[in-house]
Every structure is written in C-alpha cells, then in structure tokens.
Amino acid sequence: MHLESIVLRNFRNYENLELEFSPSVNVFLGENAQGKTNLLEAVLMLALAKSHRTTNDKDFIMWEKEEAKMEGRVVKRGQTVPLELAITQKGKRAKVNHLEQKKLSQYVGNLNVVIFAPEDLSLVKGAPGIRRRFLNMEIGQMQPIYLHNLSEYQRILQQRNQYLKMLQMKRKVDPMLLDILTEQFADVAINLTKRRADFIQKLEAYAAPIHHQISRGLETLKIEYKASVTLNGDDPDTWKADLLQKMESIKQREIDRGVTLVGPHRDDSLFYINGQNVQDFGSQGQQRTTALSVKLAEIDLIHEETGEYPVLLLDDVLSELDDYRQSHLLGAIEGKVQTFVTTTSTSGIDHDTLKQATTFYVEKGTVKKS
C-alpha cells in the first residue's frame, strides 16, 4: 500500500497544493514552523479522519475559508483508490471512489498509517488516556467495526453518567433505568475489552522480539492490558458477569460521584522490561526503545491483519533518537514501507534509506521537489 499523490485545498497553511510521492521514502526538509508537520497531518487525516494534534475541526481550515479539502490516490492490492475528505465548520464529509460515505467508520481503513512523533515517546510514560487513544486509533483502522462499537460505548456511557448525575442530585427518576443502562453498558464494554486485549496480545508477539534485538538481547518486553474486569480465560460472558458484579458493588460510589468508575474508558496498558514496570522504573532509553519497538510492531501487525504494509509517518522523531535507534528504525523499514519523514536536517544521519529518498523542501507553505 502507498499514497501516490495528495491534493490540499485551504488546509492549514496550504491554499492549493498538489504533490506526487515516491512509493519508498519521502523527506520533507525545512526549518521549524514552515508547514512540514501539516503535510504529515494531512496524510493522517486522509487515512483516519483524525489528527494527532487537535480535535477541533476549525483548526484545519485556512483563515477566512469555508472548508478544507484533501484528496489522495491510494494504491492497494494493485488498484488505485481515490479518497476525499472535506472539513467544514459543521463536520466532515468523506468519499471513497467518488462515493459519499454515510459514516466515517465506513471510510477509515482504506489507507492504513502508523505515525511516530515526539509525543509518541510518551506512549509508555504518559497518562493512560494516551494509551487508550493509541488503541482506539490502531484497532479502528484495522477493524472499522471497532469504531462503531466505540461510538456506541461512548453514547451509552454519556447516558449512564447523566443518569448517575441525576441520582446524585436526588432528582425523581425511574430507579430501574440504571440497571438497564448498566446491562447495555456491560455488553459494549466487554466487546471493546475483548478487541483491545486481543490486540495487545498480538502487539506483544511482534514487539517483544524487536525490543530484544534493539536491546542487544538484554531485555524482555511484556505488554499487559489492565482491564476493569479480571481477564480469566477467553469467555466474554465470564468477563461480563465479573464487570456487572463489580459495578453492583460500587453502585453507591458511582451515584455519590455522579460518574461511571469502571470500563474501557478507565483501562490502561502496562509495559514491563525484565519484570519491571517501565512506566515507573524504566530509564529514558528503555522507554524510547519500548516506544520504538511498539511502533515497528504496529507495522508488522497491520500487515498481518490487512495483507499490506501501512504508510509510516515519522514526524521530527529522528532527532529524538540516538544513532543506534535511528539506524535500527531506518533499517527496519528499508525497501518495505512507504515512509514520510519531516526533519530540519538530514546531516548526521548516515543511512542509505535517507540517501535514496525523494526530498521536498518546505518553506512558508510552499513545497518544492528536489
């Protein structure tokens, strides 16, 4: 899979831009604040209809314009697939093969991407919400039904929280409704939990040998999905019963606080090196090796799930890695994955992958191919 071309209209600082790309490595070179990251963000938006930088759609639209628009030609399984995404003040519209998609969940998955940006180095050390967003993004593009389930979960969670808030304020409401909402909540929660736990298991299978190699055989990586339920066995019905029992035991606490205290929105993923929790005890080098291992594992996992390698976006991350990790990253993708790199300079990075890359110079919203 690769992105053959992209067209941007009124997106960020690009009023009218058309680019054609190499199916191997493309480097966007330029000083800071010139628009390099905006280009990678456009590719990410074209793939996922979401950004790694903001959730406010207005941020994408050029000042005093009505809408931003992205078009791309994706080559997958030997076929060219046109993608279109328009962003207005009222929301997004998406097309695949020039056909309007009723839901964004039907659009996502036509272009698979893995992004590695400086903020991804906090995937290991950062707040649990960062890891939950990571799971939602990665599972969602491989299994679009996951996005539908996630949307349903968020809808029921919001309803349940509103009801708990009314109970907290001692308003007159039907006492049976909480039990009905809890049952609905548990059904969707276990669906998400199962998909996340399965993903983490597969991710570890790829990430562990990569981490072992990068650490020169000194470290063993384990990844655990820390769920609100006890993940004994593979029976979702048992998980659901455990969740319902837990929710019954904390019902009064939830009413007192007016919020749902358990579920996938409170779950986390934990990383262990040689049995030690990396979040709490890992060095900065170990945290970066773990993040790099996870990102490289994503590439192989998406290939396993979809039959094609994703597009890799490296947003100013090479400067955050030492020479050894740089070399391992570039060596792992060489000749295998279409890659987009943003950087202020390639000097000091001695690797054939960049030497053979197609280079674009970015300055004040203009892009010139070398």
Swiss-Prot record:
UniProt keywords, alphabetically: ATP-binding, Cytoplasm, DNA damage, DNA repair, DNA replication, DNA-binding, Nucleotide-binding, SOS response
GO MF, one annotated term: ATP binding
Biological process, per Gene Ontology: DNA replication; DNA synthesis involved in DNA repair; double-strand break repair; SOS response
Keyword Metal-binding (UniProt): no
Any one of the GO CC terms: cytoplasm
Pfam families per UniProt: SMC_N
HAMAP family: RecF
Chain's role: The RecF protein is involved in DNA metabolism; it is required for DNA replication and normal SOS inducibility. RecF binds preferentially to single-stranded, linear DNA. It also seems to bind ATP.
Family stated for the protein in its record: Belongs to the RecF family.
Name used for this protein in its record: DNA replication and repair protein RecF
Source organism per UniProt: Listeria welshimeri serovar 6b (strain ATCC 35897 / DSM 20650 / CCUG 15529 / CIP 8149 / NCTC 11857 / SLCC 5334 / V8)
